[in-house]
Amino acid sequence: MQSSAQTVSDYLEEVPAERKAALIRLRNLCCDLLPGFEETMMYGGPVYARGGVAEVGFASQKHFIGLYILNNEVMDAHRHLLKAKGISLGKGCIRYARPERIDFAVVEQILKAAAQSNGQICA
């Protein structure tokens, strides 16, 4: 869902009720585990940027919750773990068809790796 919300808090007020708790939890993890990143709205959704470059984001899409890990190194390092759990993946996108499919322990690992990495960002 592309939003015109100006803040992440406003964005979270617009999401479907059945996804809201999961998205709030994703936001809290991003805020806690991505020190030095700025929380902002870009591309119609919440984004966490470092040095003005978006590296992590999430969004409530029509058919899934998307977690966007735009660091190639981090995404590639966790791809096998996500595939083993049957999660749909794109180049820099993790697609959760239902909120209950989100393994927050794995998300935490990914976010910690993103915070520590300086790898190539997806174009």
What are these regions (language model features)?
Residues 1-123:
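Charge-dense, helix-prone N-terminal extensions
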